[in-house]
Amino acid sequence: MIYEAKRIGLVKYKKTKKKSRKHRRYPELLIPGEKVQIDVKEVPYNCLRGKALRDGKHFYQWTAIDECTRMRFVYGFEEHTPENSIKFLKMLLKEFPFKIQTIQTDNGREFTYKYQSSEVKSPFEIELNKLGINHKLIPPRTPWHNGKVERSHRNDQRHFYDWETFRNIEELNTKLKGHLEWSNNKTMRTLDYKSPMQLLSEKLELKSIH
């Protein structure tokens, strides 16, 4: 009887409310290099032209963003490998004018073998250990923990990849260099309408005074 009443609508079902997932808000870091987020974005296939398109190439953009100043460094590679993560890291250390204390990444094989082997360290992890840089991994399937670099990739898509094309990796990196200069000098509301370069300059000047 109860089932029949429910079926014809005499008894209303109680709707269960889905619990909304609340993403924890992290405190803003105050020291450049205290934590740097790194991630990889695959270059959209429709951006490829000429030989790159004919050969079925895939390009990948490595991105690092300092959580304090939002200063970024980007570079493109043809292969999605731990070895290219190391190359990118070495370039990053030359580009950022401050000491990096911690690097935060997802669990991709270009960064860690944690979920393939609990004992074997990836080449990237070994390199970080040699350099004395902490490596922080975000939980699996939680890209919002790397939210700053994820948002920067969405901005890259909107302001760069939606408009540009590339025939080879050299052309990608030439154009990325100009885009990086623009993004590092663009004012941001989250930085009180300062650019990453302006905030970095202020932080370094303040450090020199003390």
Language model region names:
Residues 14, 20, 25, 34, ...:
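C-terminal domain-tail junction helix/linker
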Residues 6-9, 81, 184:
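Hydrophobic/aromatic-lined pockets within catalytic cores
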Residues 37, 42-61, 69-177, 181-182:
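RNase H-like DDE/DDD metal-dependent nuclease/strand-transfer catalytic core used by mobile genetic elements
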